[in-house]
Amino acid sequence: MKKLKINYLFIGILALLLAVALWPSIPWFGKADNRIAAIQARGELRVSTIHTPLTYNKINGKPFGLDYELAKQFADYLGVKLKVTVRQNISQLFDDLDNGNADLLAAGLVYNSERVKNYQPSPTYYSVSQQLVYKVGQYRPRTLGNLTAEQLTVAPGHVVVNDLQTLKETKFPELSWKVDDKKGSAELMEDVIEGKLDYTIADSVAISLFQRVHPELAVALDITDEQPVTWFSPLDGDNTLSAALLDFFNEMNEDGTLARIEEKYLGHGDDFDYVDTRTFLRAVDAVLPQLKPLFEKYAEEIDWRLLAAIAYQESHWDAQATSPTGVRGMMMLTKNTAQSLGITDRTDAEQSISGGVRYLQDMMSKVPESVPENERIWFALAAYNMGYAHMLDARALTAKTKGNPDSWADVKQRLPLLSQKPYYSKLTYGYARGHEAYAYVENIRKYQISLVGYLQEKEKQATEAAMQLAQDYPAVSPTELGKEKFPFLSFLSQSSSNYLTHSPSLLFSRKGSEEKQN
């Protein structure tokens, strides 16, 4: 899978071109007969999106997601409320623009020449490639040449249809495919892993997130190079909304907010390990139910699933784990650390988890207040792994190399330098295994994403099964019937959504909805 990168050069070029084209519309506040004025008079920004792990999602009634968070900030920027409409597929999104039911599409849509003929793009904010996926263990095609409509299905309105048509005309005349008008890319990927479909095409970011929950989904080949992702608005001669978006993205880019939001949702990396993910999810089923009460009991300010991910990274949930360096137990504490925390038996799971949380809280308390709230945990975890003094060195090195010491995205890139003599020889606390701290935090983020998504998938499946059973037993409530027939519903039920501060969930919804956000 290609490494994700934020295309700031593309943003800059597009911003310059938009500025020239939109100059007559600036300033755009105060005019009474333009799109921005209409939005402000209405008091709400109407945004259409789709339900995916990255763009928009909800847990315990709280919305989140990369596109949602950016759209909410844009609505705040305009001084209006955000009204979100969730559609089932991309075709329905563009129908909303065509019919005047949306001001903006914020759904991880790819910029391409066909779309910009009819719709106005915003500055772009990340990039993806389109990839063909299949189920592990099934035939992996090495080319598109022989694929037929019986094998390949894509979502309606998918940008890749234009690419497929070009490939058919220029390279693969036998290529054919089917468009499923009722399903989006996420549902088609589900069909692939369930054996209902041979192949589909989705973007690289969506695939990477999907694999955290369904490691049996594999990438066969790349269909396109990286393509910039953008929002779309109507192309009708009124450029005031585009001018506002230009100003908004420029401001977000300049003050570092855009980079922080991207780090929050895209910063977990795209390196996928099938065996490791499968092993982890098996442990979720086999081991986690016994440990969950302890994680919930001691998690306190952090989400218990994040604590579980930390413990798995430390010991694979093995209370007897021991390393050659002498650290032991569920949270792999050193003897000195354990003594300072009053732990008498490092191999006692409850003592280890309790002590590990207290040690992590100590690291959290030392993180400077200038670090954004949703990034403090990553600084603390790096300090937990390599020591707080070395975290101070990493921040100092980041500042010396013209990075932002309060940005995890900037600091984590300097962590591997702590083991390189030209750098550590000039630092206060010297050599550190910074590359290990980098991998440590990244792995925890991946495990947390997998855990949250996997538990939600299980809960969704159990709820659907309970609802089906309720049709046969109408006198019994679906909830009680579900708990009776599926006892693990009690294990899956959640009472907290604190993890929203740190990472996106992976619930794939099939239903459209509409809501307002203040």
From Swiss-Prot:
Residues 1-21 form the signal peptide. Residues 22-269 are annotated as: Non-LT domain. The keyword Membrane applies. The active site is at 314. It is a peripheral membrane protein. GO terms for biological process: cell wall macromolecule catabolic process; cell wall organization; peptidoglycan catabolic process. Keywords: Cell outer membrane, Cell wall biogenesis/degradation, Lyase, Membrane, Signal. It is found in: Cell outer membrane. In the N-terminal section; belongs to the bacterial solute-binding protein 3 family. The N-terminal domain does not have lytic activity and probably modulates enzymatic activity. The C-terminal domain is the catalytic active domain. Murein-degrading enzyme that degrades murein glycan strands and insoluble, high-molecular weight murein sacculi, with the concomitant formation of a 1,6-anhydromuramoyl product. Lytic transglycosylases (LTs) play an integral role in the metabolism of the peptidoglycan (PG) sacculus. Their lytic action creates space within the PG sacculus to allow for its expansion as well as for the insertion of various structures such as secretion systems and flagella. This is Membrane-bound lytic murein transglycosylase F. It comes from Shigella flexneri serotype 5b (strain 8401).
